[in-house]
Amino acid sequence: MVQALAKYDLAVSGSTTCHRKTGMTLTEFNRLYDYKYDPKGRDVWFVIKLNEQGLYRGDCEDYSLSVLYYVVCQGSWLKFWWLLVTFQAELCGCDTKGGGHVVLRYGDMYIDNWTKAWVEREDMEELGHDFWPWYKTILPTTVAIKMALGKIRG
């Protein structure tokens, strides 16, 4: 699986403008990602778009959704939803340092806005991410509802 994920970090020729439908590499996305905490009481989920400063700004859910869309699915909504519905990819809720956190699992590997790299579950647990006993798979329907609410509240 590590070799399969390594291809997502290879250079992609052409423009580094990240709106492009073809997606981008993990390195490209990470270079343009900037953490932004949701305002209190507004937990909105988005696949992040470039802002005026040329950055992707969002929190842990936004990072996970955006890596899935831009890096893994290379800009394909069909593949994005297929991977979520078939549980080949999932957003995983965990507790960390006294708060909630979301990481992306794709195959046997995990990534979040702390690691910014594909790592094994044990590596996530070493960071303090507590998956057990209340490991929470965030269902695709929940993802869809949260993203729709994000659009409405936008």
Predicted regions and their residues:
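A structural boundary/capping signal
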Residues: M1-G154
